[in-house]
């Protein structure tokens, strides 16, 4: 087998040190299991120079946020497009189906076609159970398509064979409403005991309390399970080192626990006392609100809950800058649930939600901010949403419940059991939302998706 080489398959350098694409050995068909590395971990696992060269070489071909495996897909696609390869079959985690990763599959569809796919199947990687996708593609000459072991008319770039939602566009009307939470970039978070100790510390030379810079903190687990009572040290987005040091106990905690890690990274060492990505837009949008909506990024069920300032949302959750029950109700409806399941990706067997693909493409009954004032349909959704939230709160924290009993009362456990009262509350909410859309109560999930896609197309074209 003289045509098998031990080499970097996606990046090489010429004699001057400039990045170039490596030449792959001649072949008719390529079958492979490329290495997996999440896009967010590439700089920490590889070095900055390598990643910068990779980005430069594949600029406008592979999104910078995409996982490492996508570069093998793009390289194989380009060889097929140039007539140097007939077809390829590659394996990736099932996140290839969505987000930035899906762009490489869209390029495959633009210059050729996908003729085979196993969209989501279990796999063992380094002893751990993961979910993978298998994709076979060519120049479009293969007429027979197979998807998940069955014949299909077509295989879409999200590895579905049903209604193709990949054409859905982000709607301008939904912008600046949903935000990824704060990325702390170090152990700024505090357990309840440590938080109490730091909050009670006095004697700051600026005369200010530590509540200025220590806030309640919520991530996905606080939503799906029980609130853990964690706090986080947060010096905001622009506080200087000198001003931060005036909060003596919190600053010394960060100096001891965060600084050593942050100084190892070129990108975070200069402002090691500040969070790595403090999400300025999110903070600005939530400023002055009495409450806001949160949802976990990855969860078995698509759950929404209320939170309130000064709570800081972690990057494992998303915040919505709306405080009204109507908006909460539409998000928690069947319409938004099935749309987000199709538009999102997954982590292992749990759906992953992202604002750009799941929310910003989602057409609400009326463009946000354009809800008709006093409309009975808006009030019906609001009332059903308030009722759902009220019933859930009472179930989560019943009067007189013991601590062991409370530990079992989580939203995940509630939706696992899905008692009749919860089913009835969601049925009432869905009925109100469907009425606002002008749908019948017996509309199928597939027809919901068709209606939403048509609305997305109409609004996106109208906004151009």
Please give the residue ranges for each predicted region.
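Short, charged, solvent-exposed linker or helix-capping segments at domain edges/interfaces
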Residues: 16, 144-149, 373-375
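Conserved beta strand-loop-helix elements of the APE1-like EEP
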Residues: 131-144
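Conserved P-loop NTPase catalytic core
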Residues: 148, 153-158
């Amino acid at each position: 087998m003289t045509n098998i080489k031990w080499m970097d398959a996606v990046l090489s350098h010429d004699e001057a040190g400039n990045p170039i694409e490596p030449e792959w050995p001649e072949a008719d068909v390529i079958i492979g299991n490329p290495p997996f590395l999440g896009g967010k971990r590439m700089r920490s696992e590889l070095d900055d120079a390598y990643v910068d060269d990779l980005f430069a070489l594949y600029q406008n071909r592979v999104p910078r946020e995409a996982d490492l495996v996508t570069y093998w897909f793009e390289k194989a696609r380009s060889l097929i497009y140039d007539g140097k390869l007939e077809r390829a079959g590659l394996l990736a985690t099932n996140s290839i189906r969505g987000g930035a990763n899906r762009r490489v599959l869209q390029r495959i569809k633009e210059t050729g076609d996908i003729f085979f796919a196993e969209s989501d199947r279990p796999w063992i990687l380094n002893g751990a159970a993961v979910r993978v996708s298998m994709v076979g593609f060519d120049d479009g000459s293969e007429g027979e398509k197979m998807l998940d072991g069955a014949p299909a008319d077509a295989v879409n770039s999200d590895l579905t064979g049903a209604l193709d939602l990949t054409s859905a566009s982000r709607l301008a009307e939904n912008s600046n409403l949903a935000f990824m939470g704060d990325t702390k970039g170090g152990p700024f978070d505090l357990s309840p005991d440590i938080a109490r100790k730091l909050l009670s510390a006095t004697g700051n030379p600026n005369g200010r309390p530590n509540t200025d810079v220590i806030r309640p903190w919520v991530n996905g687990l606080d939503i799906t399970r029980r609130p853990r009572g964690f706090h986080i040290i947060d010096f905001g987005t622009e506080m200087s080192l000198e001003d931060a040091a005036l909060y003596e106990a919190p600053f010394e905690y960060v100096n001891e626990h965060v600084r050593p890690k942050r100084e190892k990274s070129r990108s975070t060492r200069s402002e090691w006392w500040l969070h790595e990505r403090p999400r300025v837009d999110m903070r600005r949008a939530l400023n002055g609100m009495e409450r806001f909506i949160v949802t976990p990024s990855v969860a078995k069920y698509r759950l929404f809950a209320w939170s309130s300032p000064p709570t800081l949302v972690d990057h494992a959750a998303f915040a919505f800058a709306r405080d009204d029950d109507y908006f909460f109700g539409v998000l928690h409806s069947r319409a938004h649930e099935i749309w987000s399941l199709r538009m999102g990706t997954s982590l292992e067997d749990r759906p992953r939600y992202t604002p750009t693909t799941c929310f910003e493409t989602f057409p609400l009954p009326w463009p946000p901010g354009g809800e008709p004032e006093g409309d009975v349909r808006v009030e019906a959704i609001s009332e059903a949403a308030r009722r759902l939230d009220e019933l859930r709160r009472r179930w989560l924290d019943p009067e007189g419940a013991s601590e062991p009993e409370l530990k079992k009362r989580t939203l995940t456990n509630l939706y696992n059991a899905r008692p009749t009262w919860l089913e009835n509350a969601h049925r009432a909410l869905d009925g109100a939302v469907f009425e606002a859309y002008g749908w019948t109560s017996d509309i199928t999930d597939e027809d919901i998706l068709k209606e939403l896609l048509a609305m997305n197309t109409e609004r996106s074209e109208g906004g151009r």
